[in-house]
Amino acid sequence: MGRFIFVSFSLLVVFLSLSGTGAHCPSGWYTYEGHCYRVFQQNMTWEDAEKFCTQQYEKSHLVSFRSSEEVDFLVSLLKVDLFWMGRRDIWNERRLQWSDGTKVDYKDWRAKPECIVCRATDNHWLSTSCSETHNVICKFET
C-alpha cells in the first residue's frame, strides 16, 4: 500500500512539473505562451494551407502573431524563408462606401485576393497572390 502511494505521488509530481513545458501540445508541436505551433515544409496555396491546418488539429489555423517576441520564437524554429500567415485581404469582403456615404452595392474588382506571407530572414510581412505556394505554420491555443 505504501509503495502504491509513493508511486502515485511520484507520478503526480512528474505530471505537475511537465504541465508548463509543452506537454499539452501534441507530439511534434512546439509551445509558446499558451499556444502550440508546427512548421510544415510543404508548399501550398493559402487556401490549401488553411484547410491543411484545420485538419492537423481541431482548433488549428494558419499562424497569427500577437507580439514581436512570438515572431522571434517562431523564426528560431524555422528552416524556411517564406511562410503563410493567417491573414488575407479579400477585396469582395471590404466594407467600402462612396464619397457621398452610400454603400457600395456594385463591385467590378479586377484585383485578385491578396494574402500575407512572412519573410523569416527579416520578419517582414509581404502581400502576395493567394495562389502562390509557400510553407505552412499551424497554430492553436491550448
Curated annotation (Swiss-Prot):
Query: To which species is this protein native?
Result: Sistrurus catenatus edwardsii (Desert massasauga)
What name is this protein filed under?
A: Snaclec 2
Quaternary data: Heterodimer; disulfide-linked.
Q: State if Cell inner membrane is listed as a keyword.
A: no
Tissue specificity note: Expressed by the venom gland.
Residue span of the signal peptide, if any?
A: 1-23
The record ties this protein, via Pfam families, to: Lectin_C
**Cystines in this chain:** 25-36, 53-138, 115-130
- UniProt KW keywords: Disulfide bond, Glycoprotein, Hemostasis impairing toxin, Secreted, Signal, Toxin
Main function: Interferes with one step of hemostasis (modulation of platelet aggregation, or coagulation cascade, for example).
Q: Which PROSITE patterns match?
A: C_TYPE_LECTIN_1 (PS00615), C_TYPE_LECTIN_2 (PS50041)
Print the organism lineage: Eukaryota, Metazoa, Chordata, Craniata, Vertebrata
Q: Return the GO cellular component terms, semicolon-separated.
A: extracellular region
Matching entries from InterPro entries are given as: C-type_lectin-like (IPR001304), C-type_lectin-like/link_sf (IPR016186), C-type_lectin/snaclec_domain (IPR050111), C-type_lectin_CS (IPR018378), CTDL_fold (IPR016187)
Q: Which residues form a coiled coil?
A: none
- Add the further remark from the entry: Shows greater sequence similarity to the beta than alpha subunits compared to other heterodimer snaclecs.
Q: Could you tell me one molecular function GO term of this UniProt entry? A: toxin activity
Q: Which residues are glycosylated?
A: 43
Q: Which Gene3D superfamilies match?
A: Mannose-Binding Protein A, subunit A
Name all C-type lectin domain ranges: 32-139
Where does the source fall among the domains of life?
Eukaryota
UniProt-annotated location(s): Secreted
